[in-house]
Amino acid sequence: MIYSPTEQFEIKPLLTVNNMLTLSVNNYVMYVALVVTLMYSSVFLLNRTYLGFNRWGVALLAVYDTILNMVKSQMGARGGMYFPFMFTLFTFMLVANLVSMMPYSFAMSAQLVAIVSFSLSLWFGCVLMGLSKHGWGFFALFVPGGTPLALVPVLVLIETLSYSSRAISLGLRLSANVLSGHLLMLILGTLMFNLMGSSMLGFMGGFMPVMGVIAIVVTEFAIGMMQAYVFTILLSSYIKDSVYLH
């Protein structure tokens, strides 16, 4: 990773089975399993009797309450049935972004194809939900109320393009932010490392940007948490559109 800024984003096969089909276990699958394991381990290791009486319990309750209030504010009282899914999704994204901050780790959220495919499946699920609840009335979402008849074709086209772009923008926003932040950290860290190894003067000068790199790392932690929340709140907004048609 010292010589290639993009090496940390490469998917590498760890175990390959060649038969009629090529099956492989790669580092992406390994990190997905790691994130899921960390998610469920944190729940099982937390003693419910002491929930709220230690820092870990207070933090978990704060996250739980934040996502619950977000879902209720987006979808009202009927949104409670979607809360378990939204909380699980937020926790998965949050843990994945935090794990990717480990040195020499693998940035799952920076895999554009995987994240966009995931967001596409979520968007398609919202469309199916709207069709199952409202039938053909779901397409009333693309015609705002009070629209003059002459403008209906144009607005339907615009609304269709806007609604369809959600499938890509949902994952693209997350992936682009994580990718850019990790690249910036790696490039500045590599520059500082090479500068300190060049000469004694370079070694002394290499300490100057340390505070800047630390600030970027702290900012990237905040961005990882914020992007997990943004991903969740946008998806809850899309679900609200499918349920209430507005």
From Swiss-Prot:
InterPro entries: ATP_synth_F0_asu, ATP_synth_F0_asu_AS, ATP_synth_F0_asu_bact/mt, F0_ATP_A_sf
UniProt cross-references to Gene3D superfamilies, sorted A to Z: ATP synthase, F0 complex, subunit A (1.20.120.220)
UniProt GO MF annotations: proton-transporting ATP synthase activity, rotational mechanism
Sequence intervals crossing the membrane: 25-45, 51-71, 79-99, 112-132, 138-158, 178-198, 203-223
Major localization listed first in the record, in broad terms: mitochondrion
Keywords for the protein's UniProt record, in alphabetical order: ATP synthesis, CF(0), Hydrogen ion transport, Ion transport, Membrane, Mitochondrion, Mitochondrion inner membrane, Transmembrane, Transmembrane helix, Transport
Oligomeric and partner information: F-type ATPases have 2 components, CF(1) - the catalytic core - and CF(0) - the membrane proton channel. CF(1) has five subunits: alpha(3), beta(3), gamma(1), delta(1), epsilon(1). CF(0) has three main subunits: a, b and c.
Role: Mitochondrial membrane ATP synthase (F(1)F(0) ATP synthase or Complex V) produces ATP from ADP in the presence of a proton gradient across the membrane which is generated by electron transport complexes of the respiratory chain. F-type ATPases consist of two structural domains, F(1) - containing the extramembraneous catalytic core and F(0) - containing the membrane proton channel, linked together by a central stalk and a peripheral stalk. During catalysis, ATP synthesis in the catalytic domain of F(1) is coupled via a rotary mechanism of the central stalk subunits to proton translocation.
Name of this chain's protein: ATP synthase subunit a
Organism: Debaryomyces hansenii (strain ATCC 36239 / CBS 767 / BCRC 21394 / JCM 1990 / NBRC 0083 / IGC 2968) (Yeast)
